[in-house]
From Swiss-Prot:
Its main location: cytoplasm. Keywords: Calcium, Cytoplasm, Fatty acid biosynthesis, Fatty acid metabolism, Glycerol metabolism, Golgi apparatus, Hydrolase, Isopeptide bond, Leukotriene biosynthesis, Lipid biosynthesis, Lipid degradation, Lipid metabolism, Lipid-binding, Membrane, Metal-binding, Nucleus, Phospholipid degradation, Phospholipid metabolism, Phosphoprotein, Prostaglandin biosynthesis, Prostaglandin metabolism, Ubl conjugation. It catalyses: a 1,2-diacyl-sn-glycero-3-phosphocholine + H2O = a 1-acyl-sn-glycero-3-phosphocholine + a fatty acid + H(+); a 1-O-alkyl-2-acyl-sn-glycero-3-phosphocholine + H2O = a 1-O-alkyl-sn-glycero-3-phosphocholine + a fatty acid + H(+); a 1-acyl-sn-glycero-3-phosphocholine + H2O = sn-glycerol 3-phosphocholine + a fatty acid + H(+); 1-hexadecanoyl-2-(5Z,8Z,11Z,14Z-eicosatetraenoyl)-sn-glycero-3-phosphocholine + H2O = 1-hexadecanoyl-sn-glycero-3-phosphocholine + (5Z,8Z,11Z,14Z)-eicosatetraenoate + H(+). This is Cytosolic phospholipase A2. Ca(2+) 1 binds at D40, T41, D43, N65. It is an enzyme of class 3 (hydrolase). The N-terminal C2 domain associates with lipid membranes upon calcium binding. It modulates enzyme activity by presenting the active site to its substrate in response to elevations of cytosolic calcium. In the presence of phosphoinositides, regulates phospholipase A2 and lysophospholipase activities in a calcium-independent way. Has primarily calcium-dependent phospholipase and lysophospholipase activities, with a major role in membrane lipid remodeling and biosynthesis of lipid mediators of the inflammatory response. Plays an important role in embryo implantation and parturition through its ability to trigger prostanoid production. Preferentially hydrolyzes the ester bond of the fatty acyl group attached at sn-2 position of phospholipids (phospholipase A2 activity). The keyword Signal does not apply. The keyword Nucleus applies. Pathway: Membrane lipid metabolism; glycerophospholipid metabolism; Lipid metabolism; arachidonate metabolism; Lipid metabolism; prostaglandin biosynthesis; Lipid metabolism; leukotriene B4 biosynthesis. The modification Phosphothreonine is found at T268.
Length: 749
């Protein structure tokens, strides 16, 4: 990997698009020709088409039997001024069977000047005159935010949250240990992380959150980040109308009931019909639909069935006074022909924004999935419901959905299923979509009249619904293939210019615990090619992008928390990832996160995997910067693993188990149980299995509260010694300076 420059960044060039506005005013003497006019009076309408822009075809309404129509309809196009843009105007006659073209004209937009507004006449068939009003202006307010900095809403949240945490930490730690908390500048930024792992991760994280809530640790956290299964629990918790007034204890009881049912009950004919009809509505509006949409509906029906209309934006009310940690969710953008271990862009989701920090491009959550061009929305859709995002965040399970439901007839269970998920790559779930162009630009000119169009759409819907129903209720190719299972959305970076530049990196002077040389970077954790192509850019010409479960690259959401602008001091991570056995080393995902961080020049403590050989399996491990005076920006990590150790002997910290029943309920294995009750592919948890896993992680967390408190005290001291402790100051990020490109292109000696 010696060819990789660790300071390489891909940024979006600041650029401007043009907004071209057309008002179709009127037409006079519309004719079908002498013979045609004898048979019928025209029913005219106008189609506008610019091939170089998305959402390229527009049309007016039609008037029955009117040769002098007055439309006064306004249409807007977003244009790239660097392309040749030609407006094609087609005068149409609406007919019952198929509409008729009455004439076509073109107008080259390069003749328009910015700020100009004019009326332009067009003549058809030497008789008909049509008047269009045209204007051109610069799009000065794009819908994407181009910046590496945090959004203003998150900055405001952080300031409010620090005020709350200051008082909460004093209460938690006591006056002596919190004596260093003089102001909000002394408040450390604490982040809590949950891994993927299906319902095992979700149930385990529910126990964790109960313990953190009861102990007061949650009140001291700024961020809560989840991946796949943990993100499902976070979605369930934050979308609950009674949270945070009602704590996880009550909400977890509802969750236990919801996951006790057979998932096949979700596939009753009535429910399937409702799912598919809802998806048809999305498809017919012009949005891509994949199996991940269906999976999201099933997850939603299981976990948030009484609030299926909830959106990510609506979760703002849970943090509007900084009363809870800011929830962060994630997925990956992947390429069809590249393993996600080699290339993946991390996409982050919060109630405030969705975007990719790699490129510094962010949008409001309600715009995710809308059609963009050059940073401006050209077609806005309704905000995707939260359950759609839950399907995307955990989409690895839609790949082997037949295994989840047990409809394939396969008898393989347990570790075999884990291994199968382990071997999935993005190439298995992302089809190479050859039909990337807009459907609308491929349509023939004209449409049928409203009645015929309605009949045509109804036939299409019936056919599509029938195919989807048959695929869902039978062991069809849809279950047996992994192709095309990824989530798919319109590419919000379509048409942008990406510039590979080499900044005077704000990270370059940071001293990490151990600088990685080429040999260390080449050391594989899971795959010889891991992260080989992470510096490659997204394809800004592709009209749609594929988004998949982040666990397909590594199973902990560290990239969200390691964003330099967030300046996190203490990370408490909970790893529910599958292991070959209960006695296997638990650091694979953490080592991948470390390697990713080092390759991106982000501070990260050295993870010593040999601590497992020296100390054996423990409930949690602490990894610190060895020299905090030098490694001023390196966070401390407390890493909890899924292990049943002290829980077998104690029903609460310091309270031994005494009765036979108490001992039997705690005597279980996680990964060595031949019945595999905690398999990643288990989507039904009987009450006993739920309670065992929930109570285990509740105990493990409470049993190590002092470890967390001590780390908080140390983090306060680090803050006092280094008042500006933050990986990158927000002002520096916005003021980045770049090397001269000509200098960079000079040959090296």
């Amino acid at each position: 990997m010696s060819f990789i420059d660790p300071y390489q960044h891909i940024i979006v060039e600041h650029q401007y698009s043009h907004k071209f506005t057309v008002v179709v005013l009127r037409a006079t003497k519309v004719t079908k020709g002498a013979f045609g006019d004898m048979l019928d009076t025209p029913d005219p309408y106008v189609e506008l088409f610019i091939s170089s822009t998305p959402d390229s075809r527009k049309r007016t309404r039609h008037f029955n039997n009117n040769i002098n129509p007055v439309w006064n309809e306004t249409f807007e196009f977003i244009l790239d001024p660097n392309q040749e843009n030609v407006l094609e105007i087609t005068l149409m006659d609406a007919n019952y069977v198929m509409d008729e073209t009455l004439g076509t004209a073109t107008f080259t937009l390069s003749s328009m000047k910015v700020g100009e507004k004019k009326e332009v006449p067009f003549i058809f068939n030497q008789v008909t005159e049509m008047i269009l009003e045209m204007s051109l202006e610069v799009c000065s307010c794009p819908d994407l935010r181009f910046s590496m900095a945090l959004c203003d809403q998150e900055k405001t949240f952080r300031q409010q949250r620090k005020e709350n945490i200051k008082e909460n930490m004093k209460k938690l730690l006591g006056p002596k240990k919190s004596e260093g908390l003089y102001s909000t500048r002394d408040v450390p930024v604490v982040a809590i992380l949950g891994s993927g792992g299906g319902f095992r991760a979700m149930v385990g994280f529910s126990g964790v959150m109960k313990a953190l809530y009861e102990s007061g640790i949650l009140d001291c956290a700024t961020y809560l980040a989840g991946l796949s299964g943990s993100s499902w629990y976070m979605s369930t918790l934050y979308s609950h109308p009674d949270f945070p007034e009602k704590g996880p204890e009550e909400i977890n009881k509802e969750l236990m009931k919801n996951v006790s049912y057979d998932p096949l009950l979700l596939l009753t004919p009535q429910k399937i019909k409702r799912y598919v009809e809802s998806l048809w509505k999305k498809k017919s509006s012009g949005q891509p639909v994949t199996f991940t949409d269906i999976f999201g509906m099933l997850i939603g029906e299981t976990l948030i069935h009484n609030r299926m209309n909830t959106t990510l934006s609506s979760l703002k009310e849970k943090v509007n006074t900084a009363q809870c940690p800011l929830p962060l969710f994630t997925c990956l953008h992947v390429k069809p022909d590249v393993s996600e271990l080699m290339f993946a862009d991390w996409v982050e989701f919060s109630p405030y924004e969705i975007g990719m920090a790699k490129y510094g491009t962010f949008m409001a959550p309600d715009l995710f999935g809308s059609k963009f061009f050059m940073g401006t929305v050209v077609k806005k859709y309704e905000e995707n419901p939260l359950h759609f995002l839950m399907g995307v965040w955990g989409s690895a399970f839609s790949i082997l959905f037949n295994r989840v439901l047990g409809v394939s007839g396969s008898q393989n269970k347990g570790s075999t299923m884990e291994e199968e998920l382990e071997n999935i790559t993005a190439k298995h779930i992302v089809s190479n979509d050859s039909s990337d162009s807009d459907d609308e630009s491929q349509e023939p000119k004209g449409t049928e009249n409203e009645d015929a169009e309605r009949d045509y759409q109804n036939d299409n819907q019936a056919s599509w619904v029938h195919r989807m129903l048959m695929a869902l209720v039978s062991d069809s190719a849809l279950f047996n293939t992994r192709e095309g299972r990824a989530g798919k959305v319109h590419n919000f970076m379509l048409g942008l210019n990406l510039n590979t530049s080499y900044p005077l990196s704000p990270l370059r002077n940071f001293t990490t615990q151990e600088s990685l040389d080429d040999d260390e970077l080449d050391a594989a954790v899971a795959d010889p090619d891991e992260f080989e192509r992470i510096y490659e850019p997204l394809d800004v010409k592709s009209k749609k992008i594929h988004v998949v479960d982040s666990g397909l690259t590594f199973n902990l959401p560290y990239p969200l928390i390691l964003r330099p602008q967030r300046g996190v001091d203490l990370i408490i991570s909970f790893d529910f990832s599958a292991r070959p056995s209960d006695s296997s080393p638990p650091f694979k995902e953490l080592l991948l996160a470390e390697k990713w961080a080092k390759m991106n020049k982000l501070p990260f403590p050295k993870i010593d995997p040999y601590v497992f050989d020296r100390e054996g399996l423990k409930e949690c491990y602490v990894f610190k910067p060895k020299n905090p005076d030098v490694e001023k920006d390196c966070p401390t990590i407390i890493h909890f693993v899924l292990a049943n150790i002290n829980f077998r002997k104690y029903k609460a910290p310091g309270v031994p188990r005494e009765t036979k029943e108490e001992k039997e309920i705690a005597d279980f294995d996680i990964f060595d149980d031949p019945e595999s009750p905690f398999s990643t592919f288990n989507f039904q948890y009987p009450n006993q299995a739920f309670k065992r896993l929930h109570d285990l992680m509740h105990f493990n967390t409470l049993n190590n509260i002092d470890v967390i408190k001590n780390a908080m005290v140390e983090s306060i001291e680090y803050r006092r010694q280094n008042p500006s402790r933050c990986s990158v100051s927000l002002s520096n990020v916005e003021a980045r300076r770049f090397f001269n490109k000509e200098f960079l292109n000079k040959p090296t000696a």
